[in-house]
């Protein structure tokens, strides 16, 4: 079906627009939305890979029409591809098979697989095929290894369901093979056969618990049913849950399963993919060394002058080496897109409105100076090999060309200090440069947060050297005071509970509110604690649990509180020690009202210390942790209230997953703590980016967004690319 008229602008179809500049793709997407708006009560559905892209696109839509925007960014449903995909499954299959055709969650979802694997693994380790797992789990007294292994395996099988569903189908049929990209079946290596066997065990266990309906809820099974149902759809029977238009923007790669689903949805919806492609020529078979997969269909043409037939060993000699070395994901994605892209069906529609579907522009337009960075971008755009690059560009003068710079530092703090100095120099050289034009990316923002706060935060806002900044993408457990305090409380059985530990807790407003301690009372408490000789440890028993000899009660919190309370009781009448306790006499008057809340806090910590130290099942842990939240926190701000709500929701989800998995084994605090806090840190589209200051974030959410200055920290060989160890 060819779309050629103005009336066809919102008709169903699968349309792909390529471009080497994300700004150009954004401009086309905004222009398309402006020219072909949906009805007033319809939401636009936009799929993005991160909140950074989402914010950037919304800001462009909100620009005035004179500046290329739509004037407003409203009625937008911006979501992640996986979430949209599951919603599409439910919409289509519910119309065909009934409301319960696709459950809201599946036993094959990663959070539920974790606890099913936790239960199943111990019974499997005696089988010879699981010997590699048995070796890894040796000496696992605190179950930490088993939990980490279960998480990694659940993540692995979750990825297999998206990217290698054909492997899982073969394993479920009893075939220990791997299916290659050409469809060939190769035997699974002996050391990896446990994966196929474990998948079969998981399927049998789910079938025993939930029957065939449980197996039918796997992602691969639902996907097959969805594709079959979509073949029967047409424009007259579009499911009400499917949007009329779906825009996929700024996503660097999508799995074949998602592209299949989008192509199926395109039978009844308009699907527009804006693909960031750095090269105007076909480069899907220009690869490093011999990693060759040729494609029969190609949207783009080969670069003029390139031989039609290349030996595998010569492919990388006819292209820009960065594309050959680092472009594997992009090559695979372009090859997949070529399988679904029928450009002749929509090219006339775009050209009829003076729009292009191939938005490739040289970075050297308008006689721009050929800096080293622009040369590199143009080499990638034109697919120049190194020999041609040397002949094309003049030699670079390092003294004048500052487009690409490298700095070496001996520590993270020194890296940030150099960054701060470089940014001050950049602002001085270019008065038009603003803090929001600068992006700083790090592999792990939590490792650099303290250094950034120390360097960028040491100057007052009215200081001319002050640079406003925002730390985005930080883990909540390292950013929100309530969660930082909760993590400390969840370490009570292993915590020394020093004076600084307790005072850090009292710096948290929700803790002070729970025990009725005003912020103005903290200096008094510090004076009392120092005067009473308190150092660390709840009492002698808690110190003994940390492998110290019994009976060492001096300078504990119990020791100091006895001195404080005795001093308050006897006042000025104190005449030396009473029953071995020297009263602390600097307590009285209105200040004495703080003694009660301090005693209540210490009593609560002692009760929680005793409770948390004992392993128990998931249901009991749920009761304990809710009691901990109620006993130690009272939310007085919206942020604290939201944090407590998320903690409650994470507890509910954990208990539901463990109950479905049939896990009744007692779990230690270490496993519970890491899982609970990690769930609160799960990535979402609610994080704040592009707040008008220097943006400091991890590489993932911001890497595709263009900024005038891009800085990278932490590019150490062991940190990027990061090696994840089990």
Predicted features, each with a name:
Residues 1-726:
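Polyanion-engaging groove/track-forming segments
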């Amino acid at each position: 079906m060819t779309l050629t008229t103005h009336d066809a602008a919102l008709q169903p179809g699968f349309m792909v627009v390529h471009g080497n500049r994300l700004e150009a793709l954004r401009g086309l997407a905004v222009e398309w939305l402006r020219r072909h708006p949906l009805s007033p009560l319809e939401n636009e559905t936009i799929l993005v890979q991160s909140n950074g892209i989402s914010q950037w696109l919304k800001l462009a839509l909100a620009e005035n029409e004179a500046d290329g925007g739509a004037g407003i960014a409203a009625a937008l449903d911006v979501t992640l591809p996986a979430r949209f995909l599951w919603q599409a499954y439910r919409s289509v299959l519910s119309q065909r098979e009934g409301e319960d055709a696709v459950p809201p969650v599946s036993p094959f979802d990663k959070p539920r697989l974790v606890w099913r694997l936790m239960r199943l693994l111990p019974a499997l380790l005696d089988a010879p095929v699981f010997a590699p797992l048995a070796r890894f789990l040796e000496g696992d007294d605190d179950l930490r290894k088993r939990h980490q292994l279960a998480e990694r395996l659940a993540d692995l099988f979750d990825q297999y369901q998206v990217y290698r569903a054909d492997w899982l189908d073969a394993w479920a049929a009893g075939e220990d093979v791997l299916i290659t990209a050409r469809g060939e079946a190769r035997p699974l290596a002996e050391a990896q056969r446990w994966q196929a066997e474990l998948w079969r065990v998981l399927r049998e266990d789910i079938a025993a618990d939930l029957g065939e309906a449980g197996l039918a809820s796997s992602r691969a099974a639902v996907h097959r049913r969805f594709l079959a149902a979509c073949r029967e759809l047409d424009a007259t029977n579009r499911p009400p849950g499917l949007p009329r238009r779906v825009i996929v923007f700024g996503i660097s790669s999508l799995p074949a399963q998602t592209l299949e689903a989008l192509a199926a949805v395109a039978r009844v919806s308009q699907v527009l993919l804006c693909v960031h492609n750095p090269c105007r020529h076909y480069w899907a078979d220009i690869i490093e060394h011999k990693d060759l997969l040729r494609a029969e269909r190609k949207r783009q043409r080969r670069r003029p002058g390139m031989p039609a037939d290349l030996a595998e060993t010569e492919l990388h000699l006819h292209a820009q080496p960065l594309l050959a070395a680092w472009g594997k994901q992009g090559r695979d994605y372009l090859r997949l897109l070529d399988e679904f892209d029928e450009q002749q069906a929509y090219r006339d529609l775009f050209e009829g409105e003076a729009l292009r579907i191939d938005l490739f522009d040289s970075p050297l337009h308008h006689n721009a100076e050929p800096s080293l960075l622009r040369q590199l971008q143009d080499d990638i755009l034109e697919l120049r090999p190194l020999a041609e690059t040397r002949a094309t560009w003049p030699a670079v003068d390092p003294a004048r060309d500052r487009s690409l710079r490298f700095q070496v530092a001996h520590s993270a703090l020194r890296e940030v200090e150099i960054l701060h100095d470089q940014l001050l120099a950049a602002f001085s050289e270019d008065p038009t440069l603003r803090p929001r034009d600068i992006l700083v990316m790090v592999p792990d923002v939590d490792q650099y947060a303290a250094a950034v706060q120390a360097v960028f935060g040491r100057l007052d806002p009215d200081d001319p050297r002050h640079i406003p900044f925002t730390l985005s993408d930080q883990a909540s457990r390292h950013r929100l005071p309530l969660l930082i305090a909760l993590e400390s409380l969840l370490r009570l059985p292993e915590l020394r509970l020093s004076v600084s530990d307790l005072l850090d807790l009292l710096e948290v407003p929700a803790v002070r509110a729970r025990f009725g301690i005003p912020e103005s009372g903290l200096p008094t408490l510090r004076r009392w604690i120092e005067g009473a000789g308190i150092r660390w440890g709840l009492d002698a028993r808690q110190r003994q649990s940390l492998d110290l000899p019994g009976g060492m009660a001096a300078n504990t919190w119990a020791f100091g509180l006895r001195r404080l309370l005795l001093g308050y009781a006897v006042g000025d009448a104190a005449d030396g020690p009473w029953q071995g306790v020297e009263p602390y006499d600097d307590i009285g008057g209105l200040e004495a009202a703080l003694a009660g809340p301090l005693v209540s806090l210490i009593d609560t910590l002692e009760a929680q210390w005793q409770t948390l130290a004992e392993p128990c099942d998931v249901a009991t842990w749920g009761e304990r942790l809710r009691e901990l939240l109620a006993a130690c926190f009272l939310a007085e701000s919206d942020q604290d209230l939201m944090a407590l709500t998320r903690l409650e929701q994470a507890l509910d989800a954990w208990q539901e997953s463990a109950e479905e998995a049939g896990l009744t084994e007692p779990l230690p605090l270490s496993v519970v703590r890491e899982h609970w806090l990690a769930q609160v840190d799960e990535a979402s589209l609610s994080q704040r980016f592009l707040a008008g200051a220097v943006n400091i974030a991890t590489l993932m959410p911001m890497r595709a967004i263009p900024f005038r200055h891009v800085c990278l920290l932490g590019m150490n060989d062991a940190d990027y690319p990061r090696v994840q160890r089990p």
